[in-house]
Amino acid sequence: MNHILFLLTAAFCFPSITVAKIIEAGSPDKKNVITIETDNQVSYSLSRNGTKILDTCPLSLTVGNDTWGTDKCRKITRKSVSEKVEFIVPRKYKETVDNYNQVELIYKDYKIEFRIYNDGVAYRFVSTANNKQPVKKESVSFRFGQDHTSYTLLTDQLQNWFEQDYTVKPINALPKDSFSVAPVMVEVDKYKVLLAEANLYNYPGMYLQPALESFHGIFANYPDKEVPYEGDNKIYASTRKDYLIPTCGKRVFPWRVTGIFDNASSILQSELIYLLSEEKEQAADYTWVKPGKVLWDWWNDRNIYHINFKSGINTDTYLYLVDYAAKHHIEYVLIDEGWSARNDLLTLNPDVDIPRICEYATKKGVGIQLWSKWVNIM
């Protein structure tokens, strides 16, 4: 370790000396350790309390004809951060602490950032020049080195409802032609390991495909032609380009996240994904956002009993649901599809008096949420 640190220090003082090819860094509590290799292709491995979590995991990003992560690293920097972060919308507490150690690999037109937290590790690519080339491919791998039980939400389509049941099986027992929606959980000895992403903007979401004792990221290429689906206001890509996004630009890419937890309940308490995400509109006003429980008519298909009217998509049903929400201290009623025309939010269903429902709900102290498909608000 001293030899590694000497090489790192020497690289700062004498730029002509080759930077360290193996870098080690730990979490603030020293339980998580990452080992980064920069020779030929950048890769990393992880351990917690001496237990191997991830074996050697190579990573790269193909921009135009260049493959980032395979060229010569020019410089390595480190820093430690511990600062209070106030939640945009308060929950059980108003703020948390963003505490991590960071290693940064600096290249000619990009850099790779690694952050090591007490509850996980993440890395991302950062474009430092306004690169006009398309991003053609990203290679993401989570290699465990041996088989472990995994929790996956499997699908065989890049566009779907994400409503499948979870499959609990060893990685090697999963069908290799399927892939899972993130996050995926893997049990490594006594630890719960969560594979996920964070800060996803203007980039395809990551699916995770099982391979031998591993998961690999796969991504939907940029849509070429889009067509309506089944006559509904859903749009599907019928053909795709040969790239992920048309222009790289000067930007940050999504974080590739490995959460490492001592038990399942720790996952619920973790703010790792939140801390890795960035607020895009710094001056935006979020004070109007009020957290709360919601009564959603879709869950019970508007089946209510012992009433003197016909239940369904109508004003009386929603007034009844508002009364129920007020009585049981439920902050919101969500009115699902049917309150407007399918393809026009401004054409209201005459059987659902939205202004009357909203006025009544306000008097009862209940908020109204109106469901819409994304194509109607773009």
Locate each region found by the language model.
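Bacterial Sec-dependent N-terminal signal peptides
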Residues: 1-22
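Short, solvent-exposed loop/edge-beta patches enriched in aromatic
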Residues: 6, 16, 108, 119, ...
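Charged interaction patches that mediate protein-protein contacts
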Residues: 10-11, 185, 364
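Substrate-binding cleft of carbohydrate-active enzyme catalytic domains
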Residues: 288-378
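Short, cationic low-complexity segments
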Residues: 279-289
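N-terminal accessory beta-strand-rich subdomains and adjacent acidic, glycine-rich linkers
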Residues: 22-281
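Compositionally biased regions
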Residues: 14-17, 28, 363
